[in-house]
UniProtKB/Swiss-Prot annotation:
Name the UniProt record assigns to this protein: 4-hydroxythreonine-4-phosphate dehydrogenase
HAMAP family found in the cross-reference section: PdxA (MF_00536)
Residues bound to substrate: H135, T136, K273, N282, R291
Cofactor note: Binds 1 divalent metal cation per subunit. Can probably use ions such as Zn(2+), Mg(2+) or Co(2+).
Amino acid sequence: MSLRFALTPGEPAGIGPDLCLLLARSAQPHPLIAIASRTLLQERAGQLGLAIDLKDVSPAAWPERPAKAGQLYVWDTPLAAPVRPGQLDRANAAYVLETLTRAGQGCLDGHFAGMITAPVHKGVINEAGIPFSGHTEFLADLTHTAQVVMMLATRGLRVALATTHLPLREVADAISDERLTRVARILHADLRDKFGIAHPRILVCGLNPHAGEGGHLGREEIEVIEPCLERLRGEGLDLIGPLPADTLFTPKHLEHCDAVLAMYHDQGLPVLKYKGFGAAVNVTLGLPIIRTSVDHGTALDLAGSGRIDSGSLQVALETAYQMAASRC
């Protein structure tokens, strides 16, 4: 039996539904289930001029074979309000979270080998009165996972984050021995178990410019990061650093590593997105399930226009397929 995967279209007024439909033009190697409003997909297909055959499926009768080119399996999930491309509506916030819940729970229950997510709009979900900081945190709660790690990857580069969506002024206080220990262990374990890398080598960024310049530009490297890395090396983790980020992100260093651990969001991700924007994938590590996502946002201004590239979603699909194969 072929592995099944769940696909969530994210914000209904954004480009997520468009991406799902564009992918359906080509056959996939595994059954791919779009957890979405059938009405939304029908309307968006008409706006895009796409002739996609939407095939209804449900937990009572999952497909065993991949859909053909021009077909898309849909687990219908009703909207609360009609959708106009590019126009956010907080009434549909619960719909977005329902698609994620169905996909995540389906993975936990063994219905899906992994889930692939299109972008959501955090702001409109919070405006609806639902606290929401992102896919990563939502899925951690759903799966009762205490610690997860956000990693983005493109060809030749993987970057994981010690901290994610924090104001910059709060980052230094968040870099603790406990946090770094958990993040490094998760990164090491998932590179081995989900990516099939037997002995992962990880480069670790310092927090401060020049990795603190021997304590003259900050002491986090001396007091927190270096002692933590040294102790983890004693557990068998191959950790290089802390290194100055502007030195670490050079070919000399990157060609000899499997992943980079950056201390904060905008330390590591600008480099990765410059290298591979449109062909990068967001992976949530530490979960008991496989979850990958695109590397871009909802692009409300492009929804329904046909002027989008589905490359990142295709990479997210391929990465999920590869990760699932590594676990089999």
